[in-house]
Amino acid sequence: MADKITARNEDYSQWYIDLVRSAKLADYSDVRGCMVIRPNGYAIWEKMQAALDRMFKETGHVNAYFPLFIPESFIAKEAEHIEGFAPECAVVTHGGGEELAEKLYVRPTSETIIWSSYKKWIQSYRDLPILINQWANVVRWEMRTRLFLRTTEFLWQEGHTAHATPEESQEEVMRMINVYRTFAEEYMAMPVIMGRKTDSEKFAGAEETYCIEAMMQDGKALQAGTSHNLGQNFAKAFDCQFQTKDSRLDYVWATSWGVSTRLIGALIMAHSDDRGLVLPPKLASRQVVIIPILRGDKAAVLEQADAMAASLKAAGIPAFVDGSEQNSPGWKFAEYELQGIPVRIEVGPRDIEKGICIAARRDTLEKSELQLGETLPGAVQEILDAMQKDMYQKALLFREENTVEASSYEEFKAAVEKGFVIAHWDGTAETEEKIKEETKATIRVLPEEDGYIERYRMNEPGTCIYSGKPAAQKVVFAKAY
């Protein structure tokens, strides 16, 4: 029930944990750093998977599956990659009761094991491109964990593609980061900033990393997806060459891209409130709960509720009836608000006499009278569509209201405690690191969106807020998850 949840303005971190556990989305495991994704949470992941998988296939990708274990010799082939991931790796040293001749790494990501296969599959330009996605689990030995946001084991998808030219691979990188952007905005109702990472923030072994960054309700940033241009680094590490159209030998050009169950954490923190989960309808496996008010002729009320659910389901709206009598209607209202069911419909004997029912939106708690009968599915769909749109607009307005421009370091330090800060940066890793050390804020993204660039004049030269040196552009700073 909602009274288990700490208020956001009292303790935001505790609010998040309380909500995740009270709404039965996930729980702690007896295995250190790991979580149990409960059915309510996994249902959200399934909706995300279904939408993303369709989008991947529409852009020409196919699914495959590669081993969980990676030989140590494979990991060591890409020096920058192993340097980036070694501290987070789990390593298998024994199997079948004996010490292994070669250690096996439990995948933190799959570039190395996949490129060992690509080397066997690619001989000619005719074998390219390869556009493969994998749905899998990965392990990164995290010291400080938080449900969905940072766990030792998590679920994700990782795309790995191989191309004949650098132009093709860059097109793929941008195509996929835009797929993620579309998914975040159209399904999650979560506005994001799309752009590049700085060299110090990019993926280990990548030439460039592109990302989408979202603002949570506490003003912090959350990286919601990444797409990496790997250049020829992994092809060279695995000696993956192909014969070009003009009969030359060249190394293959590569990309990788991924999102994870971290998106569920983003969804929770972007939209939910002190009553519980607020889910955008497109990611709700159950969009409507019908609660019959069981007074008078209970059988007639239940019959009406079942007929309403059937008509909604026939129209493609997932609906269910809670006709149980062990809990009061008030208890049910609070419970389904906690679980984030987008629309609640109440119907009782008097409503049936009037030919109406009462619908309540989860996001605004606004109630409206709807006519019973054949117009009901259309009216409910209108509410769901409005809710999806309004949740995005509310989150966008919140981001805009909590994004400020800073022209001095003092302004910056005050503003970065509350949200995103747009400021000039001199382009050096030294300045970036100093700001991070002193404020815990990082450069989240160098925006690539025309609208965002124009709104905040991101390409306008100026003076670095920290060093006072000339700066060619502004960047987005924030504290982050």
Swiss-Prot record:
Query: Where is it found, in Gene Ontology cellular component terms?
Result: aminoacyl-tRNA synthetase multienzyme complex; cytoplasm
Which protein, by its recorded name, is this? Proline--tRNA ligase
Question: What's said on domains?
Answer: Consists of three domains: the N-terminal catalytic domain, the anticodon-binding domain and the C-terminal extension.
Q: State the compartments where it is located.
A: Cytoplasm
Question: What does this protein's UniProt record list under function?
Answer: Catalyzes the attachment of proline to tRNA(Pro) in a two-step reaction: proline is first activated by ATP to form Pro-AMP and then transferred to the acceptor end of tRNA(Pro).
SMART domains for the chain: ProRS-C_1 (SM00946)
Major enzyme class? ligase
Coiled coil location: none
UniProt-listed InterPro entries: aa-tRNA-synt_IIb, aa-tRNA-synth_II, aa-tRNA-synth_II/BPL/LPL, Anticodon-bd, Anticodon-bd_dom_sf, Pro-tRNA-ligase_IIa, Pro-tRNA-ligase_IIa_arc-type, Pro-tRNA_ligase_II_C
Q: Which domain of life is it from?
A: Bacteria
Give the enzyme's EC designation.
6.1.1.15
